[in-house]
Amino acid sequence: MSPIAVTSQTPATEVPSVKEIPQVITKSSPVENLILTTYPEDSSPIPLQWGAPSTDSRGPIIATRYKEGLAKHNAIGAHSGSYCVYHALAVGTKQLDPEHVADYTNSQPAFAVPEQKTWYNDEDIVAMDPFGHLTPYLFDEVSTKENVEIRPTIAVTKATMQLFEMKDAVEKGRLEVDGEVVINKNGDLNVSKVAVEPVWYLPGVAKRFGVTEEELRKALFEDTNGMYPELVTRPDIKVFLPPIGGLTVYIFGNPDFVSDPSKKLALRVHDECNGSDVFGSDICTCRPYLMFGIEEAVKEAQNGGSGVVVYFRKEGRALGEVTKYLVYNARKRGGDTADEYFHRTECIAGVRDMRFQQLMPDVLKWLGISKIDRMLSMSNMKHDAIVDQGIPIIERIPIPDELVPPDSRVEIDAKINSGYFTNGKVMDKNELKSVQGRTWNDVK
C-alpha cells in the first residue's frame, strides 16, 4: 500500500480513513517496521469482561505491546496515566529495558481493602480497575502462560502525614493526641493511602455522559490529534487507559470502617490546585478547605468513625495550570469582580469547568461507601454526582468564613451564586459586582 498524502487542498470528503493509512512505516523512514495500529482480524486479545461475576472470568488488563502484547493486548492507551511519556523516554534513551520484568515482591497492599459487590458491576465502576491493586498476584499465571506484561493500576500503602495546620490544631486544642490517629504533639497523623491510575470502561463512561460509545471514541481520537488510532480501529476493545492524572485516597482511622454503614464517615473530595495546596496562593480557598477537610476527617476517626480525603489530579478545574494562570491575568487586569469570575474562564477556555464529576464517585463505590455523614464540600457538582450514583449525603459542611482568605472572596461568592452550598447569604448578580479582589500591586 502506498503512502497517501493529505494536503491543505484535499477536500474534506477525500481525507482517507484510518484503515487506508499505511500500517507499517517503510525502511526509508527513520523508524523501521513500526505498526501504527491494529485491527480485530489481526489480533487475539486476552478475554476481558468488565463487570464479570468473578476475577477469573473478568481477566487482566493488558495495555503494552511488549512480549506478545501487540497481538494480545485488550486495552487501548498506556499505563501510568500522564507519566506514560516519561516511561517511553526512558526506553527511547536506553535507560530502561522495554522487556524489564517487574519484581513485585513485598509490594502487595499494606492493608486489605474489603471486597465490594460494586467491583463486579459494569455500571457502578467505569473509571478505574477495581482489581488494579491485585492484578500482579491474581493474574501471574496468565502473564507467564500468555507471555504478556500485566501491571497494577492501584497501590495501597501506609504513611505518616506531617502538616503545619495539624500541629497548629493540636497546639490550640482542636485536635487531641490519641497515639493512634494523631500520633504526637507535633500533629503527625497515621494515614492509609491508595494511589489510583485511570482505567476507563468506554461503554460505561459513554453512558455516564449520555453519549454513544462511538461519539466518545471519535472525540477522544480527534481531539487528541489522533493520539490513539485504536479508539477507531478497535471497537472490540472496550477499555482505555487515558493519559490523564489519577487520584489518591487518604484514610484516617480504621480502613474497615469506611464501608461500615454503622460508622460515621466524614469525606472531602478535593481537586488539585498546586498554587494553593502546595505553594499557599491566597486567590482561592483550596488549601484552607483541604486542611479543614483533613482536620474534620481526623476528628471523625477519633470519634470512632472514619475520615476520607480523595485528591484528584484535575488542576485548574481540569483546564490545566497554563489556562488557569491566563485567567488570573485576565481577572487582575480586568478588575477581578465576582460577577465576572466564571466569564473570564469561559472567554479563554470556552467552558468554565472540565472536571466531569460524573466519574468521581467510582472510587467511593470501590471503597464501599454507602452513605456520607459529613460532606466537607460546597460543590453542587460533586454533591449531585455522588447522590446520582445512589450514595446519600446526610450533612454538607461549608468552609468556615474565618478560613476564607480575603482575595478568595471573589471565587467563593461567585461559586455560591452559581449553586455552591452555603448556610449564609447568596449574593445576586448586582451584589457580586461589589466583591473585588486586590490588584497585583495592592499587597499589604
Swiss-Prot record:
Pfam families named among the record's database cross-references: GTP_CH_N, GTP_cyclohydro2
Species this chain originates from: Lachancea kluyveri (Yeast)
Positions bound to Zn(2+): C273, C284, C286
Active site: D353, R355
Enzyme Commission code(s) on record: 3.5.4.-
Matches recorded under Gene3D superfamilies: GTP cyclohydrolase II
List of residues binding GTP: R268, V269, H270, D271, E272, E315, G316, R317, S377, K382
InterPro entries according to UniProt: GTP_CH_N (IPR022163), GTP_cyclohydro_II (IPR032677), RibA (IPR000926), RibA-like_sf (IPR036144)
Primary localisation category: cytoplasm
Gene that produces this protein: URC1
Annotated GO CC locations: cytoplasm; nucleus
Protein function: Involved in uracil catabolism.
SUPFAM superfamilies per the UniProt record, alphabetical: RibA-like
Nucleotide-binding in keyword set: yes
Keywords annotated in UniProt: Cytoplasm, GTP-binding, Hydrolase, Metal-binding, Nucleotide-binding, Nucleus, Zinc
Protein's name according to its UniProt entry: Putative GTP cyclohydrolase URC1
Enzyme superclass (EC): hydrolase
Localization in the cell: Cytoplasm; Nucleus
Family named by the database record: Belongs to the GTP cyclohydrolase II family.
GO molecular function, one term: GTP binding
A GO BP entry: riboflavin biosynthetic process
